[in-house]
Amino acid sequence: YRLATQARGARHIVVPARDYGHDLAAMFEAITPDTRVVFIANPNNPTGTFVPAGEVAAFLARVHAAHGERVTVVLDEAYTEYLDPALRFDSARWVEQYPNLVVTRTLSKAYGLAGLRVGYALAQPRLTDLLNRVRQPFNVNTLAQAAAIAALGDAGFLQRAYEVNKAGKQVLCQAFERLGLEYVPSYGNFVLVRVGDAAGVNLALLKQGVIVRPVAGDGLPEWLRVSIGLPEENQRFIAALSQILGT
């Protein structure tokens, strides 16, 4: 969001995290008379933390009551399909309630269509009209649209993706515990783990053909974000990391 904001010539305000997650109270207090957009990723990237529905609903109500339609809240739900069913909620009902809310979803994660660059947004007509004025005219090609429609109807694949991710997450977290590494419990398809010399570990992993994401740019120089893969991919990462750390 910071880069997107800067690219538009706007001024960004980064609100410090609380326990690696969103501090909604602090985010509300950070709103100024010049504020126009507030971004919330839920589950969050790169930490994987999650804000429960009740807290999000209270934040939306508070922002709308104080600022009306002047401040738009963007709720980025890119990783929502990885949530346990008991934690999921229907954010579309909030769109009906709040004219200042945009909910964004992507098919790049759980649906496996990252190469097609396709997703969608939910909002009331006032905001969708503004978005349609500035979006590129051919931003999603016909093949991507057809694939997206098919993917949205494939509940079986989505369930398998959820189950594979859940099992892989457990494997990674157990490995981190055996290695004595601190990690952040994740609600997404990745786990944030503290390895100390993250730059050095990342380079060593790359030499073994294992790609993870350094997050020093997010203020976490000792941490790596590790995406959850297939069982054999997870084991390859664990073996490489264990060798590098000498454990």
Protein language model regions, located:
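Short beta->alpha connector loops at strand-helix junctions that form conserved
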Residues: V14-D19, V215-A216
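Conserved PLP-binding catalytic core of the aspartate aminotransferase-like
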Residues: A17, K166, Q174-Q208, L224
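Substrate-binding/gating loop at the entrance of the active-site cleft, primarily
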Residues: Y1-A10, F138
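PLP-dependent aminotransferase class I/II
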Residues: N100-V184
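Short beta-strands and strand-loop turn motifs
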Residues: I13-V15, V37-N44, T72-E77, V184-S186
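PLP-dependent enzyme catalytic core of the Aspartate aminotransferase-like
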Residues: G54, A58, K207-Q208, V212-R213, ...
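Active-site pre-lysine segment of PLP-dependent enzymes
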Residues: Q6, H22-D34, P46-V73, E77-A110, ...
